[in-house]
């Protein structure tokens, strides 16, 4: 009987201790004989406060992690693989600049193509013009003449007279109207030789020196004298000297 009482007393004083080897933890004491009230007084759940060293370590790790990597903004990274927003903006700006530059170059090329082409060029310091168009009033088909093969106005006028009035079958009727060779430069015939310069103005052939003429001529026209009256008046004596002067 005494043994049973002592055993019961020993059981009532039995304590259950819980602890962790991580250090510093408190033990929860639970008594069997306390009933519900005793359980509420002696028994409770372990929390982070019971392990101060562990909690401090986790807090320190969280703080160091937060300090080493700042929070990522949604506007900071776009696309995949990730591309910085500033780099994306740079790419967009470069593309826009490239498009604007291409449009500007295309516009310059179009303007350049629309400009009248200069038929003159220099070879070994000498002006080389090449072939230019020649038209005559009353003749539907035009011709071309090589200015490089001529050295003076007289030589050029003689070539054009032979071209339109002696070798062209379509001008037989015109040739029969004249009993003497045409004089395109002295104003003694029904026709006069004119040219269009690079500025688009029609001028009388022979009013400037030969070199200046071949640098500015675009095309020739054998025009009726009645239609050429509005052009600049010619000074016959100075022009005669310029026409006969070789290059």
Swiss-Prot record:
Q: Which residues form a coiled coil?
A: none
Composition bias type Polar residues, residue spans:
87-98
User: Which portions of the chain have biased composition (kind: Basic and acidic residues)?
Assistant: 106-119
UniProt tissue specificity: Preferentially expressed in stems.
Give the record's family classification: Belongs to the Aux/IAA family.
Biased composition, class Gly residues, residue ranges: 25-40
Protein name from the UniProt record:
Auxin-responsive protein IAA13
Compartments reported by the entry = Nucleus
Protein source organism: Arabidopsis thaliana (Mouse-ear cress)
Per UniProt, the short sequence motif EAR-like (transcriptional repression) occupies residue numbers 14-18
- Role, per record: Aux/IAA proteins are short-lived transcriptional factors that function as repressors of early auxin response genes at low auxin concentrations. Repression is thought to result from the interaction with auxin response factors (ARFs), proteins that bind to the auxin-responsive promoter element (AuxRE). Formation of heterodimers with ARF proteins may alter their ability to modulate early auxin response genes expression.
Q: Which GO terms describe its cellular component?
A: nucleus
């Amino acid at each position: 009987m005494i043994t049973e009482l002592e055993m019961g007393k020993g059981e009532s004083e039995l304590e259950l201790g819980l602890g962790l080897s991580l250090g510093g933890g408190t033990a929860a004491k639970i008594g069997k004989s306390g009933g519900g009230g005793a359980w509420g007084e002696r028994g409770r759940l372990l929390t982070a406060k019971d392990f101060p060293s562990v909690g401090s370590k986790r807090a320190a790790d969280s703080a160091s992690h937060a300090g080493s990597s700042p929070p990522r903004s949604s506007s900071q990274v776009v696309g995949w693989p990730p591309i910085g927003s500033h780099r994306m903006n740079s790419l967009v700006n470069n593309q826009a600049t490239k498009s604007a530059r291409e449009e500007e170059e295309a516009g310059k090329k179009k303007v350049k193509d629309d400009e009248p082409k200069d038929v003159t060029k220099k070879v070994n310091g000498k002006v080389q013009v090449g072939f230019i168009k020649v038209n005559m009033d009353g003749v539907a088909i035009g011709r071309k003449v090589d200015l490089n093969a001529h050295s003076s106005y007289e030589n050029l006028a003689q070539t054009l007279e032979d071209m339109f009035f002696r070798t062209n079958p379509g001008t037989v009727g015109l040739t029969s109207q004249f009993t003497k060779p045409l004089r395109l430069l002295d104003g003694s015939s029904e026709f006069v030789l004119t040219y269009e310069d690079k500025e688009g103005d029609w001028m009388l052939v022979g009013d400037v020196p030969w070199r200046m003429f071949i640098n500015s001529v675009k095309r020739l026209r054998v025009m009726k004298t009645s239609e050429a009256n509005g052009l600049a008046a010619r000074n016959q004596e100075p022009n005669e000297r310029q026409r006969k002067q070789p290059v």
